[in-house]
Amino acid sequence: MKCGTRSLAVLGALALSAMGLVPAAWAADAGQSGAVEASQSGAAQTEGTQAQSGAAQPEEPTQPAHSSAPETSAQSGEASPGLVDTPIPDIQAVGAGDDSAMVGATVTTLGVVTAAYPAAESGLGATLDGYTIQTPGSGGAWDEGRASSDALFVYAGKNGQVPAIGTCVRVTGTVGEFPATTAKENPQSLTQLAATSVSNVEGCQAVTPTPVTGVPTPDQAEPYESMLLAPQGTWTITDNYQTNQYGTLALTPGESPLRAATDVVAPGAAARDYEAANAARVIALDDGTNTNLLNGAATEAAYAYLANGSPARVGYHVSFAGPVVLEPRHGSFVFQPTSMVAGHPDRSPVTITGQRPSAPAVGGDTRVATFNVLNYFSDLGVDEAGCKGYPDRTGAFVTAKKCKVRGAFSREAFANQEAKIVSAINALGADVVALEEIENPVAVGVGMDRDASLARLVEALNKAAGSGTWAYVPSPQIVPEAEDVIRVAFIYKSATVAPVGESLIDDDPAFTGLARQPLAQEFARVTAERSAPASFVVIANHFKSKGSVPEGAGEGNVDNGDGQGNANAIRVAQAQALASFAARFSDKPTLLVGDFNSYSQEDPIKALETAGWAHVSGAGEASYVYSGRSGSLDHVFANAAAKPLLAGVTSWAVNAQESIAFEYSRAGMNAHLAIEADNPYRSSDHNPELIGLTLSGGGEPAPTPSTNPSTDPSEAPSPAPASSQAPSPAPQRGLSQGTTASTRTTPSRQTRTPSNLARTGTDADRAVGLGVLLAAAGGGLLLVARRVRRRG
């Protein structure tokens, strides 16, 4: 529903009230306008990164075939329901597992239709093809002593007639479970009646929805299976990853989304207990269909809970304006609307409210940011021979798929990606930005200019902000011989700060072939006299992801279920190597920033704290959302010299809380949703961190800044000799050179030509050990099981 409009959902609430299916107060409340907002995007996801669209997701199994559609008769002249063969609670009485004890039996029963899902409504193929009935006069207050449900799903088949909500019907059919059984499996199944005949009945008592204030446990949910519920109070969106693909929102009661366990508590038993509690407090709000909304005719249907101007962001609040049905789908109980909302957002049973945040203020006179820009590749898949991509609904490739390049496939996709990133960076208000996931064309094998993509980004930033506003720190003369296809980098505003000397790369073996090498750069504030009272060092980082275990990795790298995922020992070694590298700058204010692929209480973060680094990132903020859990993989650390200069540290929730539907990679996936390339929201999958420094209050004079910042791709020093093992450069003012592993000389750039637009990709294997953690914790009721997230 949209702000200030009286939708058909209002009329539906009034009608349901008249039939006795909703509290009268709901009908009154439904007429009150409210601010409503909702949001989305679609491929596979891993911890710390989102995947490309078009990845296949498991569909709900096909319903059992029947020889004929149920016979429907309209014998509406009966004065009273009369006797029935089998009451619904008897059909729902459990036998083995959660299965009905009457599976396979043919029965006749009576009920009031509380939810209706006609076959192929709105042209969507995978609909529920049936309706829900509930014992006349049942419902009302929650009953902890309830032994069996008073409601039942009736499968009508693809050609069967579905009675209207409020109709009282007598149904004959065969009792079954869908999927087939839970007797030997953990996931719940739906008890259903495959109808063979249906007749209308008059004189039935109305059904009353049962109020609920939280998520029922599995034991509580089974005796309320398929019954009409009235969720009360405020709920919060904790996950929207599937909203544009399967139409679901993951909700939790209260006013805050769920947190990632190891962002709050220590790994191990505490994290397992925390995640078990999380799992017990989340339930999906479905859209009344099983359709994959990224496929076929479904791409023409409007999303249930997501629209331009109404982004259903993680953290937005939800209130229920109408009843829902509690039923198991895909192994978990969900709140199912009483009719299909996919294609009919006006039928939504909920009101969603919230507001997108503007860039925050942090104070100080100099601001530093760190931003993972989701595989910004200026080399494109379309220009790589044999490269394929993930298609939009027209079949046009949007993002590269298993190519040398990552990121955007087409020029249009790259333009969308770049526009959002430029909008976000220019809105940050930062003077220095450490970037992660910038293309390294040399490592990709598509060029000799290591800075080509970085220069392209600065060119785009200056086109939007004004010529000369931004410059980039060029690669140092000596760079590692073995690098990743993505790298870290620095850009800065040349009117306020300038680099001091050459940057320095930490080529420790802990990073080689496993992650991106850290990059250090000293900066000085520029004043009218071209000097500043203090300089500072920033070290950009991008540690190994959680998603995979490299071949030959040692002990401590396989996910052991403690909540830290894969490659934890590798990340600890990287943290220790970083601490050793950064120790050389102990006499200067120094910040460690970037994507550490570790939550706040995990071992790599503790290793840096043990080494004396203050973890100054904002407590309780979240730079990333994975599987409905919010936490920070991106961090800021300060040494003793930097702490007194801190004016503030915060995160801008511009990306992670947004639906992936607004990401450039999901452009053209739905006829009713634009990705909004003109704004910064969902410019990446990570939120940027922003740090305020106060440098004007004193301190020793800073070293003289470098005088020739790289502000344009055409400006570069003269070419250097093309030697693979260049001698070390002469000492300069700025960062002192450290011992590196195998290195090579960076080709200098006298004439830089813009690179042909090209690729995008991110840490291909980033994923969290949440599934293992859940298993170790004994699972939970309502973790939606439809999703398999990978990074391709």
Per-region residue spans from a language model:
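Sec-dependent N-terminal signal peptides
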Residues: C3-A15, L770-G771
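C-terminal segment of classical bacterial N-terminal signal peptides
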Residues: A18-W26
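C-terminal membrane-anchoring or membrane-association module
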Residues: A24, N756, G769-G792
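Boundary at the C-terminal end of the N-terminal hydrophobic targeting segment
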Residues: A25-A30, A35
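Extended non-catalytic accessory segments flanking core domains
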Residues: G77-T399, Q417-E418, P509-F511, Q517, ...
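Divalent cation-coordinating acidic motifs and surrounding scaffolds
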Residues: Q161, T248-L249, N292-N295, P337-P701, ...
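C-terminal low-complexity, Ser/Thr- and acidic/Pro-rich disordered "stalk" regions positioned immediately N-terminal
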Residues: G697-T762
